[in-house]
């Protein structure tokens, strides 16, 4: 079954921040484009069998169904809803960050969710 993939406002900001950091801080726009392409490709792949990646191991996120998709040095956090056939991308973060602290401040209720397509 094909799922619709949605991107939270925070995840969209995360992707923009990753691109800007690599392109401008590291002065490598080609690498920034390549990294963004790889992240987008993996996000879009979640339209089929999104449960194939592991659940996040810590509560309260584990019981909420949060899953983790590693891509290079980054992790994509998402929740699949099998009833609605929707995958919501919550965060995209550098794997070396304090992930617990970043997730603690994330509240889905305050998020704006948008449909995700390859034409970001």
What are these regions (language model features)?
Residues 1-62, 108-120:
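Basic, Lys/Arg-enriched alpha-helical interface segments
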Residues 38, 52-54, 67, 91, ...:
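Basic side chains
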Residues 49-83:
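Basic/aromatic recognition patch in beta-strand/loop cores that engages polyanionic ligands
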Residues 71-75, 79-120:
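Enriched for short, Lys/Arg-rich terminal
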């Amino acid at each position: 079954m094909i799922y619709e993939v949605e991107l939270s406002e925070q995840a969209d900001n995360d992707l923009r921040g990753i691109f800007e950091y690599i392109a401008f801080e590291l002065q490598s726009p080609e690498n920034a484009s390549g990294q963004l392409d790889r992240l987008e490709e993996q996000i879009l792949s979640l339209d089929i069998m999104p449960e194939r990646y592991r659940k996040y191991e810590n509560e309260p996120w584990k019981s909420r169904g949060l899953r983790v998709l590693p891509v290079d040095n980054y992790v994509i956090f998402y929740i699949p809803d099998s009833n609605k056939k929707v995958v919501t991308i919550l965060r995209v973060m550098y794997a070396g960050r304090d992930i617990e602290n970043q997730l603690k401040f994330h509240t889905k209720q305050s998020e704006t969710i948008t449909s995700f397509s390859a034409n970001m």
